[in-house]
């Protein structure tokens, strides 16, 4: 531990090395610009100035300082590579790429929309009156409804109609059965049995 502290004091940070001064333990640049990042500090010093950088470090929360210094170093390097535009050149380039991608996306969406074919609805053939009579549960086409949806009263009327139709059919069947039974009984009384075993 003692060796590490002595090595830290004996090796100046990039800022103190650039300024040719002794690096102390309370140096604000040492944690963020070690001797291995001399190029970064020189770029930051050239663009922003040492006093402004020191003021910025002291004004920030300790947990924000490292990220802020990395950002300044990146901006300074970009400014050194493109003195005219700096960071704005990268921003404009990214915005141009976004615009190109949005235009390409719109073209692709239009092409996909041209392949989407909406199927045409073909209504089923209407039933004849005879077919509707044979199927009492079928709702007649002329039945008024609200946009194709039956109301509760209409459903009740249709149920009553179906019940009355079924009742009429059952009564008609019973009458036919009674009539046939009556005919058979009359024939028996008139002609008697074919054979008399007594």
UniProtKB/Swiss-Prot annotation:
**Gene giving rise to this polypeptide:** LBD28
- Provide the coiled-coil residue spans: none
Q: Where is the LOB domain?
A: 11-112
Q: Which organism is it from?
A: Arabidopsis thaliana
Q: Which family does it belong to?
A: Belongs to the LOB domain-containing protein family.
Q: What is this protein called?
A: LOB domain-containing protein 28
The protein's superkingdom reads Eukaryota
The record's annotation in InterPro entries points to: LOB
What PROSITE patterns does the entry give? LOB (PS50891)
Instruction: Fetch the Pfam families from UniProt.
Output: LOB
């Amino acid at each position: 531990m003692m060796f590490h502290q002595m090595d830290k004091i004996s090796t100046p940070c990039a800022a103190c090395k650039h300024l040719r001064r002794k690096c102390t333990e309370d140096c604000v640049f040492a944690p963020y610009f070690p001797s291995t990042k001399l190029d970064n500090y020189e770029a930051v010093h050239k663009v922003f100035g040492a006093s402004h950088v020191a003021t910025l470090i002291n004004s920030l929360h300790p947990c924000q300082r490292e990220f802020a210094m990395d950002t300044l170093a990146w901006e300074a390097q970009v400014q050194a590579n493109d003195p005219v535009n700096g960071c704005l050149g990268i921003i404009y380039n990214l915005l141009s790429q976004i615009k190109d991608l949005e235009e390409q996306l719109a073209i692709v969406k239009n092409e996909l929309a041209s392949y989407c074919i909406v199927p045409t609805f073909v209504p089923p053939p209407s039933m004849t009156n005879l077919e509707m009579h044979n199927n009492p549960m079928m709702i007649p086409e002329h039945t008024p409804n609200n946009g194709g949806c039956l109301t509760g009263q209409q459903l009740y009327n249709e149920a009553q109609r179906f019940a009355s139709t079924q009742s009429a059919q059952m009564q008609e069947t019973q009458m036919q059965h009674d009539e046939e039974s009556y005919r058979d009984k009359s024939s028996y009384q008139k002609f008697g049995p074919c054979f008399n075993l007594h």
